[in-house]
UniProtKB/Swiss-Prot annotation:
The lineage of its organism: Eukaryota, Fungi, Dikarya, Ascomycota, Taphrinomycotina. Its EC number is 2.1.1.211. InterPro entries: SAM-dependent_MTases_sf, tRNA_uracil_MeTrfase. This is tRNA (uracil-O(2)-)-methyltransferase. It is found in: Cytoplasm.
Amino acid sequence: MKVPAYWKPREPKNALTCDPPVPYDLQSSYQWQSILEHDTCYAAEVFDKMMIELVYHPERTSSVIMRTDIILDSQEDDSILNKQKSVFENLDERYQISRWIDRRIIPRNTNLDATMDQTVVVLHEKLENDRILMYLPHLDKSLEQPYNHLPYYHPAVAGIAFHYKGSSVEVLYLVEKDFQRELSSRLLRTAHMLLLVLHKHCKGAVEGYQKRMLHDTVVERNKFQDTYVILKDKYAKQLVDNWVEKTDPGKHVFEDLAIAAFLIELWKQTYSSNKEFSFVDVGCGNGLLVYLLLMEGYNGYGFDARKRKSWETYPLWVQVKLYEKVLVPYFLHDFETKIPFPQLPAGFTMSAANIHDGRFSENSFLIGNHADELTPYLPILARLNQKCYFMSIPCCVHDLTGAKISWALPKPRNPKHGGRYAMYIEWLMQLSEEVGWNIEVEPLRIPSTRNYALIGRKLLSNDLLHSSLSTDALYDIVEKNHGSQGFFVHAMQVAAANSRSH
């Protein structure tokens, strides 16, 4: 984590303190030790808000944590607070419990790290404006030094506390009373990082920081993550170990596992059964996504202009679902009456075996995962085919001619989003809306900066369900969006070249 120039934490003058109360069952053996403190620039209400946000998002403090599941929250049941007062002796003298949360921390790799249950207690001082938030892991007290048996992502201490004092905030560890040795460098680094993360969040809140993108608006995060972990455990090792492409398996395997997990959860929302539809991966590349979806019981196929080495590593029943075909949308041929086309290669027709004309079976779901020059055609083809939906993850900036875009792209409708990729996403959304789609946008949790998914499963109006897109209307839309001249001939030339090479 980058450390800002203003960040200058210090050791408190009095490291041993009894300010935060110690849970009754730990009082005889443990005490709080203050580790670091830093000046504040925010009010107590900001501390309260940001600390609870971090309680709900522990992954912001450790890359090995995936998420937390909330087991119990007093905000949903006030009676919990009265029941838990007995945990602290003489609490009523100075503090009152304002919130009690039990949570379960879920690591990214459950083969390396265990889950951990933890209680979070928020205390408000009655006479002052002080706040204390304590993290208390559920210790196995039958063990000697039970904190040494906690997962690696938690420091080897019996508890962590943050004490807001108005002008400063400090981080404390719950340690044994006979604790005499110096803290390890790891414990010090962890305290430093925890305090810095808190300070950055609070400072950002004061300065009006708002997230540029909102995740998990289409598919719930927990459902996606649970499915991703299942897929990763089933497939990741064998796929990485047997990778035959020149590309990095550390990126591509886990990216496609995440996309497969997202699609599976999206389809659970969209369809009542996986027998209700079939998928088509347009420009399927190495075929990994097709393999994963077929293995998970979904029906479909993929095609690409060029066969990949990976295809032969899949089971035969998967290989027969991967086709070497070039997409030449049939409606471009219909435009012949409006724009001149050069001669096709001798003896070559639109019905050639290695041509896919963009006609799909009813109830198809089209996938465009970094499909490059095919990307702009997905919303059009999905609209032209019966009961057809799509999800596109755009990458390189191509228009309907198949060329890299050289014309001025529109500004994103969200002013927080900038850059050429954001403008390309905006153009694709506008094109999709022009042919009738009500587009859902989801920044996917994948290891790629080109991670926006455009999802078309709803039309702008119910009236469009009963009307088709005419050739004339489509031609006008295509021409308005800088035309398609060049795509048809280039695609046919690729198809002709492929047929000659076999």
